[in-house]
Amino acid sequence: MHSSKRVMTTKTHVEQPESSMRPQLPESIQGSLMDVGMRVRKSISTGYKSKQTTFPAYNPPLYNTVSENIALKNTAFSYEPNGTKRPFEQAIPNYNWANPPQDFEEPEWLKPFDVVMEGTNERL
């Protein structure tokens, strides 16, 4: 909660005649009431609106025509008609360099420990 309060410093109201039905309140109380009223007004979603609009909110449809839907399904990224789903292995072209043959020997320090120990007679 705020510890500072607003205090009206200037008189913006016109002096009312004595025959008014409203009781006279000190300026500090009038300022507090105005402050509370503005807080209530801010907390209501329509608090700052002075009049209602006559037009309701309108959200146009995402796609206007059937031809737009068909055009979006057939994008440049679909390799088969209608974007048929397929496994990853079929989606990648089969090039020779994709899986090169093993033409080198793997260094000892890259092999798993049990494979390294197969060639020795040592026991753990």
Swiss-Prot record:
InterPro entries: RNR_inhibitor
A Gene Ontology term for the protein's cellular component: cytosol
Lineage, broadest ranks: Eukaryota, Fungi, Dikarya, Ascomycota, Taphrinomycotina
Entry PTM: Ubiquitinated by the DCX(DTL) complex, also named CRL4(CDT2) complex, leading to its degradation.
Known partners and oligomeric status: Interacts with cdc22.
Listed name of the protein: S-phase delaying protein 1
Subcellular location: Cytoplasm; Nucleus
UniProt entry keywords in alphabetical sequence: Cell cycle, Cell division, Cytoplasm, Mitosis, Nucleus, Ubl conjugation
Entry's Gene Ontology BP terms: cell division; dCDP biosynthetic process; protein localization
Location of region: Disordered: 1-32
Keyword Nuclease set for record: no
Major localization class: cytoplasm
MF GO annotations: protein-containing complex binding; protein-membrane adaptor activity; ribonucleoside-diphosphate reductase inhibitor activity
Family: Belongs to the DIF1/spd1 family.
General function of this protein: Regulates the ribonucleotide reductase activity through its mediation of the nuclear localization of suc22, the small subunit of the ribonucleotide reductase. Delays the progression of the G1-S phase transition, thereby ensuring the G1 phase is complete. Interacts with both p34 and the p34-p56 complex, although no direct inhibitory effect on the bound proteins has been demonstrated. The action of p14 may happen coincidentally with the cdc10 function or may happen downstream of this.
Comp. bias regions, Polar residues: 1-31
